[in-house]
Amino acid sequence: MENIQTKQYPCFKRWSRKNWSVFASLHRYVTIGVLSVGMSILLLATQGASAQTADTTAVLKTLRIREVGVTGSQTAPARNAQSHTPLFDRKAQAPAPVQTLEAALRLAPSVDVRERGGKGTQADIFIRGGSFDQTMVLLNGIDFTDARTGHQSHALPVDLDCISAVELIDGVPGVGAYAGAVNIRTAPLRPTYLRLEASGGQYGYGYGNLSGAVSAGRFSVLGAASYRRSDGYRHNTDFSNYNAFVRATYDGGRAGFFDLQAGWQDRDFGSNGFYAAYNPDQWEHTATALGSLRWLKTAGRFSLGAAASYRKNFDRYDWTRGTAMNRHNTDNVGAKLWADCDWAAGVTTVGGDYAFNHIYSTNLGDKLSVPEGHYTHAKARHTGNLWLRHAKRWRHFDAAASAGVSLTPYGTSALWSLSAGYAPAAGLRLEAGAWQSMRLPTFTDLYYTSPAQINNLDLTPEHAVTYRLGMDYLKRSWNLSAQAYYRSGRDIIDWVWREDMGSKWHSEQ
């Protein structure tokens, strides 16, 4: 060991993607041999780094350090993000006997996953007392939340073997993440592989999955397809589910970094008691197609990023199986543009995002003068956010603030967030933050009417201010985390039983 020269361990001093501050908080030198683009930008499998020949470093000691999420502003879901709480990690939870994402998320104390049926047939995600409609759902940092109902937001065409991690993101101000955001990250099991899985069980259960990945130079692709079905464990609980997903990345050098993902899902399921406990004969069929393209470019202290996304969702709901009651055709389009500048006073980010939501339906939206096929109603809306964020880090202290505006059909609202962190000793970090968030009424909140429900066109956005205090302590093999939250909300939307309206449910605030 005494013959090893100091020059063999290059000390980490700066990362061109700016968010090197997470390493600075460790108060240790970080030795890195090869840092792959996949790890630094997209948090893909870290095998890309280990596969290289690290001939410029010598490994002297293996240290367990605090787990950090390397997320620069280019991967932030929207506006600003204050903290990332791991909900699922592929390596850490590999021994856990889980077969679906829903089963894995049930192990996390910060979220409440409520399933209808088995094997992820239909599930809702609740964050810290919020509703499923108040949860933003992201896939690799791209917002694919459904504007019609939160019941559909979680229906993403990815299986557990493609998911490397799931994280809870706090501190996203503005429209969308009223209670928080759940970000699902995909990555291959290894740089190049082909995997086949098949299983079966009682009640006609069967599952088949084919997945694989290829990496060649600056290009990598991950693909997967699966089929899951069952005859059901009781009357009208059968289901079938098809998934297909592909993600490709390419480092174009001066042209920038490109990240493309696309997926398709088709599922139908008997809905015995799903939406009305007294009706065992409900049935639903949904089909989802989604895709996104993200571009990242760095030039010196400046960086620029852009993303575009699209999600289409079809839904057919039968109150009595075989007799169509509701049909919906939803389009969700998103675009985002942001720029960073790393200068002496910190990192400044300016950006904006835009969302377009449109629905054709048999009963949601304004009545059409001329029907479009089965659809007699339609509605569209545009929303956007503009924001400015600045962050600064010192040796033991860091702070960030953001401000901007949300533009919605209901008017203009201010958005803001504040956060600070302090590391008084090695392994100990204290955090505090506050942010404003809001949620627009879904198309279901506004328009849904049935023999048991009455809609409300006078609904307005929900608003909340959330406060957070946190502490994290790591020493050797021990890790202790504690967090306290307080959310002050107003104009909360819920369905209320009204006897004066004919004993029906009414959407109110």
Residue ranges and their predicted role:
Residues 62, 66-99, 123-124, 132, ...:
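N-terminal periplasmic "start-of-domain" segments of outer-membrane beta-barrel proteins
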Residues 230-241, 251, 255-332:
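Flexible loop and strand-edge segments within Gram-negative outer membrane beta-barrel domains
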Residues 275-298, 423, 429, 436-490, ...:
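Outer-membrane beta-barrel signature, preferentially recognizing the C-terminal barrel domain
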Residues 213-229, 305-318, 349, 362, ...:
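Surface-exposed extracellular loop regions of Gram-negative outer-membrane beta-barrel proteins
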Residues 102-142, 164, 171:
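Extracytoplasmic beta-strand/coil segments of soluble accessory domains associated
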Residues 142-171, 185:
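Short acidic/polar hinge/loop motifs at secondary-structure boundaries
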Residues 196-200, 223-227, 260-264, 306-312, ...:
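Transmembrane beta-barrel strands of outer-membrane/channel proteins
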